[in-house]
Design a protein with these regions (language model features):
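Short glycine-enriched loops at secondary-structure junctions
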Residues: 146, 173-177, 225
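Hydrophobic alpha-helical segments that mediate membrane insertion or helix-helix packing
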Residues: 129-130, 168
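Active-site glycine/GP-rich loop and adjacent strand/helix microenvironment
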Residues: 1-28, 32, 36, 190-492
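Nucleotide 5′-phosphate-binding alpha/beta core
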Residues: 1-128, 134-151, 155, 159, ...
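Conserved AMP-binding loop of ANL adenylate-forming enzymes
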Residues: 154-190
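Short secondary-structure capping/junction motifs at helix and strand boundaries
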Residues: 136-140, 162-167, 194-197, 273-275
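Conserved ATP-dependent adenylate/AMP-binding module captured primarily in the ANL superfamily
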Residues: 56-59, 149-167, 204-216
Length: 492
C-alpha cells in the first residue's frame, strides 16, 4: 500500500525528518554494503557511512555526473552503480535482527529468503538514456524498482485527477526510454484502461487518430511536438475532440505559450477547458514528476516524492548548496533503489525558482515542489550554448521566441556554414510553416525583430515551407525526439 496520501500532508519539518531517517538507513544498509562504486568511493575518501545522518551530511559525498557513468576504457562501468549483495555482505553489514525479520516474513508468505532477495535486487528490466550528448547509458530495474515505477505512475495519475473509469492513450514513442514505460506501468498500477500506441513511429499519425476517435480517451499523453502534430492533423480533418479533458506532456519542456496554442486548437475542435500538464523526469532517477491542475495554463511546479529522493539546488560553478527557492543546478539522490543507485547526481538541468515547500496553491498538497522553469542543457549540451556569428547565445532563447509567435504553426532552426565550408562565416536559417492566411512578409520581419531583440543575432534567411515538408524535417513521425534545432556546421 502506497503511503502517498499521508506523505502529502507532512509538514516541511516532518519531511526533513523522514528524509534524514531514510538517507541514513539506505546508505548504511544498501549503498555502502552493496554498491561497488560507493564502497570504493567511501573508503578512498575516508567517509564513514554512519556519519551520514542528515541531508546536510550529503556534503561529505562528492558529486557525480554522466561522465562518471561512462568509462572510455570500461564500457561496463555502469555496473559499478548497481547494488550487488551476496551472502557474505549481507551477513557482514545487516544486523542479525534484520536478517531474522526478513527470513520470518518470507517464511510466513511461503517463500524462501534467497528467492525474495533475488527478486528485490536482480535486474529484470532496462532503459537507456537517450544518448543525445553521449553514448546511451543503461539503467537497470529489479522487481522492487518496477514497483517504484508503478507507484510514481499512480501518484501522477492522482495528481492529474484521472478517475478509474476514464480511458487514457499513451502516445509516447515505444522505446527503451523512461517516458513510455512510466505511463505503461503507472496505468496498470492505477487500474486504468490504457492504449499504448508507440507514437508516430509505430502506428503513424493516421493510425493514432483512428484509435483516438474510436476509444475516445479523456486523457492523452505524449511528447509535446507529436501531441501538437496529432491535434493539428485532427483539426485539418474536421474531427470533434470534445471528449478530451486532459493532456499530459513529457520528454521536453512545456511553456505557457505552447499550452495556450494547444488549448486554442483543442477548443476549436470542441475540447473546452482542457487541463494541460507538464511532467519532468530523467532516466537516471527512473521516475518522473508532474504538475497538478492549475488555471490559465500556469504551472504548479512538479510535485516531488520526498520519501523516494532528495533534491538539492547548487551553484553550478562552485557546487555550493543553495537555499530554498534559489536558482541553480538540480542534484538528485535516491533514497529507495535496488539496482542502479545515484547519490548526488548532477543532472545538468538548471532550475529557475528552485524548490519550494508549503501547501500547493492549486491542490493543497504539502509535498516539495520543483519549479517547471528548467533549462535542460543535458538534452543538447553540445549546441545549447553556442557561438553563432561570433555571439555566444543560448539556443533555448531562439526556441522561446519562435514558439511564442502565434502566427507560426511550426518552425525549425538550422545553423550552418556558408557553402558548407568549416572556415566560412556562420549562417542561420529559420524554416517556418505559417498559420493560414498570414502575411509572410510581415511575419518574416516580425521574426527578425524578435530574434534580434532577444539574442542579438538575426537570421540570414527565413524560408516558408509547407506543413508536410516541415513534418519530415522535424522527423515528427519517425524519430523519438523532434529535430527542432539543427547545428549542421562541419568540423574544421
Amino acid at each position: 500500500m502506497d503511503s502517498w496520501r499521508g506523505i502529502t500532508s507532512l509538514t516541511y519539518s516532518q519531511i526533513k525528518d523522514l528524509q534524514n531517517q531514510r538517507l541514513h538507513s539506505f546508505i548504511n544498509t544498501h549503498v555502502y554494503p552493496f554498491s561497488p562504486y560507493y564502497t570504493k568511493l567511501f573508503d578512498e575518501k575516508k567517509i564513514n557511512p554512519r556519519h551520514i545522518r542528515t541531508r546536510e551530511d550529503l556534503k561529505r559525498i562528492p558529486y557525480i555526473s554522466k561522465s562518471d557513468l561512462i568509462g572510455k576504457d570500461n564500457p561496463q562501468k555502469f555496473k559499478d552503480f548497481i547494488l550487488q549483495p551476496d551472502k557474505e555482505k549481507i551477513s557482514r553489514y545487516w544486523p542479525k535482527s534484520r536478517i531474522l525479520a526478513r527470513a520470518l516474513k518470507s517464511m510466513l508468505l511461503g517463500h524462501h529468503l534467497q528467492e525474495d532477495l533475488a527478486k528485490e535486487f536482480r535486474p529484470v528490466f532496462m532503459t537507456f538514456t537517450t544518448g543525445t550528448t553521449n553514448a546511451p547509458v543503461p539503467f537497470m530495474y529489479s522487481r522492487y524498482d518496477l514497483d517504484n515505477l508503478n507507484v510514481s505512475g499512480a501518484r501522477m495519475v492522482g495528481l492529474f485527477d484521472i478517475k478509474g473509469d476514464e480511458r487514457i492513450m499513451n502516445l509516447f514513442p515505444f522505446a527503451p526510454h523512461l517516458a513510455f514505460w512510466q505511463v505503461f506501468f503507472g496505468a496498470i498500477e492505477a487500474d486504468l484502461f490504457a492504449l499504448s500506441t508507440g507514437g508516430g513511429k509505430v502506428m503513424g499519425t493516421e493510425g493514432n487518430l483512428t484509435a483516438l476517435l474510436r476509444i475516445k480517451p479523456s486523457a492523452i499523453l505524449g511528447v509535446p511536438s507529436y501531441i501538437y502534430h496529432l491535434v493539428r492533423y485532427a483539426q485539418e480533418k474536421g474531427h470533434d475532440l470534445s471528449f478530451l479533458k486532459k493532456i499530459v506532456l513529457g520528454a521536453a519542456k512545456v511553456t505557457s505559450a505552447y499550452k495556450q496554442k494547444l488549448s486554442e486548437m483543442l477548443s476549436a475542435q470542441g475540447a473546452k477547458n482542457v487541463y494541460i500538464f507538464g511532467t519532468y523526469g530523467f532516466t537516471e532517477a527512473r521516475t518522473a514528476w508532474a504538475e497538478c491542475p492549475a488555471e490559465n495554463h500556469l504551472s504548479s511546479g512538479y510535485h516531488l516524492y520526498p520519501d523516494k529522493e532528495i533534491f538539492e539546488i547548487i551553484d553550478p560553478e562552485t557546487g555550493e548548496v543553495k537555499d530554498d527557492g534559489a536558482d541553480g543546478e538540480l542534484v538528485y539522490t535516491s533514497l529507495d533503489s535496488r539496482t542502479s543507485v545515484m547519490l548526488r547526481y548532477r543532472t545538468g538541468d538548471f532550475v529557475k525558482g528552485g524548490i519550494t515547500h508549503g501547501p500547493c496553491p492549486y491542490c493543497g498538497r504539502q509535498t516539495l515542489r520543483l519549479s517547471s522553469n528548467i533549462t535542460r542543457l543535458s538534452d543538447n549540451k553540445d549546441i545549447q550554448l553556442s557561438k553563432v556569428k561570433g555571439t555566444l547565445v543560448n539556443l533555448s532563447h531562439f526556441a522561446e521566441v519562435l514558439s511564442g509567435i502565434p502566427q507560426i504553426n511550426e518552425w525549425q532552426l538550422e545553423i550552418r556554414k556558408h557553402k558548407n565550408d568549416p572556415y566560412e562565416v556562420d549562417e542561420m536559417v529559420v524554416y517556418v510553416t505559417p498559420q493560414p492566411e498570414v502575411n509572410q512578409s510581415a511575419l518574416s520581419q516580425l521574426i527578425k525583430d524578435k530574434l534580434t531583440g532577444a539574442t542579438e543575432v538575426s537570421p540570414n534567411e527565413i524560408k516558408f515551407i509547407p506543413l508536410d515538408e516541415m513534418v519530415k524535417r522535424l522527423e515528427l513521425e519517425t524519430a523519438n525526439k523532434e529535430k527542432r534545432i539543427l547545428d549542421s556546421r562541419p568540423k574544421a
